[in-house]
Amino acid sequence: MRRLESGISVDNETFSDVARYENETISRTTIINSNIRSPIFWSCHLDHLVFDTCDLTNARFFAGSTIDHCTFSHSDLRSVGIGKNEAVFTNCEFSSCDMRGMTLENATFIDCTFSNCRFNDRVLQAVNIVNCTFAGKLIDITFEGNGKQKLIANIENCTLDGVRFIGCDLAACIPPASKNHLYVEHVSARVKKALEKIDDDPTLSDHDRKILVRSLRKLEQMEQYIFNTKYMENIHGAAFVERFFSHLRCSKDQM
């Protein structure tokens, strides 16, 4: 059974079922159409590795492993395990990978790109996303900060479906350029004014008022926010969304 090692290029190889790599540097390696099985990286440095159409579902990263200038393309990264704060990915590219179940929240990503990857329903810490670029559809992702943490990311080429921003500053984030996305500033001040006047709106039913208040209160701590108005309309209806942005004193058509 083959192990990962530096300077090799292999296609459709069978790797050892469970392989432990400790304090190793592995570089300049290309793996294609292979099941890497269950590698455990303990304080390792991976540099300029290429995984193309590979299965890494059982990979584990621990003890300050670093992954630099690596490319993951059309690969299965589901359930890849990362110890909390024990892996740093720098200048890595992820393209058309399945990352659902991968413990992304435990790793730090610096200058990385994610293109058309699937990592639905994950919480990403803003402090661990540094100058990264995302492209494609993001579904049910939460970007979370500590209240003033800047999210330094480029999501210009993304569609945001069910994406939430909690406790993070979006001033350094490049918002989506695609249709139906709206970037709003001074959100907390807008919310405060909206909540003060919401009882004066005679067109609101009790049900809609409750939903509107709940939706606004979720934004009380945010200075900026990015909305996908089309997604909101699919959930709440066009009339409600129109009223929501009216109370925020901004138009959903100003995109």
At which residue positions do the language-model features occur?
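Tandem repeat scaffolds
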Residues: 1-193
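Long, ordered, amphipathic alpha-helical scaffolds
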Residues: 171-255
